[in-house]
Amino acid sequence: MTASPDYLVVLFGITAGATGAKLGSDEKELILLLWKVVDLANKKVGQLHEVLVRPDQLELTEDCKEETKIDAENLSSAPQLDQALRQFNQSVSNELNIGVGTSFCLCTDGQLHVRQILHPEASKKNVLLPECFYSFFDLRKEFKKCCPGSPDLDKLDVAAMAESLNFEKNDSMSRYGASQVEDMGNIILAMISEPYNHRFSDPERVNYKFESGTCSKTELIDGNTVVRARGLPWQSSDQDIARFFKGLNIAKGGAALCLNAQGRRNGEALVRFVSEEHRDLALQRHKHHMGTRYIEVYKATGEDFLKIAGGTSNEVAQFLSKENQVIVRMRGLPFTATAEEVVAFFGQHCPITGGKEGILFVTYPDGRPTGDAFVLFACEEYAQNALRKHKDLLGKRYIELFRSTAAEVQQVLNRFSSAPLIPLPTAPIIPVLPQQFVPPTNVRDCVRLRGLPYAATIEDILDFLGEFSTDIRTHGVHMVLNHQGRPSGDAFIQMKSTDRAFMAAQKYHKKTMKDRYVEVFQCSAEEMNFVLMGGTLNRNGLSPPPCLSPPSYTFPAPAAVIPTEAAIYQPSLLLNPRALQPSTAYYPAGTQLFMNYTAYYPSPPGSPNSLGYFPTAANLSSVPPQPGTVVRMQGLAYNTGVKEILNFFQGYQYATEDGLVHANDQARTVPKEWVCI
């Protein structure tokens, strides 16, 4: 609770575009600013003032011209925004004769005039707003406090407030803007008089700057306060995001840049605001611009934010405990680099905060350095000096430098500290069989489609290939998804022969599918496997995924001991057990395998996946085929799981991995089941 100001300055802004509830949502510039002073102590209203503002783009919508009676000729000689704000400040100071102890505060019809017009536009034009624009009274909220029985805030405007107070409709001033300011002055006088006696004591606040900070994974976050911003420039920082959302209050540490599977920024960020109201205002900035790029803004959840920004490391929390620091990320450090060498690298012109204490090296779980580090600088000047050393040499390696954020520190540390190394399992009794339909071979009997529409389905691909669709192997369509599970625009098709793959590539290369031309290349199953696991395939050849697990493990000859897991089988089934082949990869049934780095792109239902944990083609012969019968079940309940299927076949010998539940294109279970007995 703060003291009530002596004066209120009623403020109203008009842009070259939308009005009312859509004000500011179209990113149009301010063209007219109107204001009037209300003396709360003496209950008097001053004169109406207005100033035209010349926008950079002299283009007005037809609705704006009709509402305001302003055209481009009127604006051509008007002052620009910074000059108009100086006129406003000077006029208010002269009228109030501001001295020691005199206070005033802005009052607007809703949040849009200050948060969605003045602050964003001033930020884009590098105009410094006066102090008075960082606090204001929302007349709608104050009226709701004064008259609880009035309509809801989303339905409350100047006309509704005047109607609730039984004011006569003002037809003397029909010009848009002036009539609203006149009515707002009268509404304020009515609110501070009998019988309401309302006090304006708790204004809205606009944050001066974004505050960085940490977020715990156990923190409770309101899911209605988070948005996802997409299309950011790769070099953007959390300060750039805060500037894009200028006027809206972002929670401390609430700007989290997202990283892709390779640890690089993917152009997305999750932003957490202080309230749902600010989140809703942020959604109105959908497709507003950051420089020359438009930014998409969508709703997100608290869980999404915690996945990116949440962390539990005490080391990170201690590193980020120093507030108001600029973070710089170093990449490509020699693995033997020390803190003293990093301090010497930046030198005296950009001293690191706290010396060696301001450096955080990133390591793998076993303590090996990754070549990444984060460094703290006390001010923007030091950080800019540091960034000028981008690609300077440290030892014999050039070092990449980027502005970073607290959330990026959490993500990088979480990624490297939580990725488990591949465990060396003990010799098991159950073999993991490779997929028989995707042998890693150099026979070029596959085709790759690149540039597919993101909405393309398997049926669209079959239609695109026309006569060659009959030459596709069973389950031979593999759609490549990105790390977020969305289509990447690539697909691999397994053909029945190399000739058909060659002819399909020749005939359909650069043919169109849904107004997009599609590139078609002939390739091998091995190349397909590399891409499905996160590698890249281009004109320069294959670039393997970040970490491939070894193709096989070799175990020593097992002793003649029956494992404890075999106790579930009948004794007759354990006679003459088959000897294990030491050259083949075997894993226990419950063993969980990990890649050192998550870069696997899953295929949709119906397109089987191929991982590098299995033996190569040369090792396939070492696993003798196991006889069995496939049983198809129909009429299953939609929520039936593998456990229920195995219970149904209790008493028969089968492996748990022999159950295959079918799913449709929307990844929902369909009532079919295949079991190998």
Curated annotation (Swiss-Prot):
Keyword field contains Lyase: no
Modified residues (Omega-N-methylarginine): 578
Subcellular location, principal: nucleus
Domain RRM stretches: 225-302, 326-406, 445-525
Signal peptide: none
Subcellular location: Nucleus
Molecular function GO labels: mRNA binding
Top-level taxonomic group: Eukaryota
Modified residues (Phosphoserine): 543
Keywords, alphabetical: Methylation, mRNA processing, mRNA splicing, Nucleus, Phosphoprotein, Repeat, RNA-binding
Gene Ontology BP, a term: regulation of inner ear auditory receptor cell fate specification
Any one annotated GO CC term: nucleus
InterPro entries to which the protein is assigned, alphabetical: ESRP, Nucleotide-bd_a/b_plait_sf, RBD_domain_sf, RNaseH-like_sf, RNaseH_sf, RRM_dom
Function text: mRNA splicing factor that regulates the formation of epithelial cell-specific isoforms. Specifically regulates the expression of FGFR2-IIIb, an epithelial cell-specific isoform of FGFR2. Also regulates the splicing of CD44, CTNND1, ENAH, 3 transcripts that undergo changes in splicing during the epithelial-to-mesenchymal transition (EMT). Acts by directly binding specific sequences in mRNAs. Binds the GU-rich sequence motifs in the ISE/ISS-3, a cis-element regulatory region present in the mRNA of FGFR2.
The family this protein is said to belong to: Belongs to the ESRP family.
Name by which UniProt lists this protein: Epithelial splicing regulatory protein 1
Organism listed in the record: Rattus norvegicus
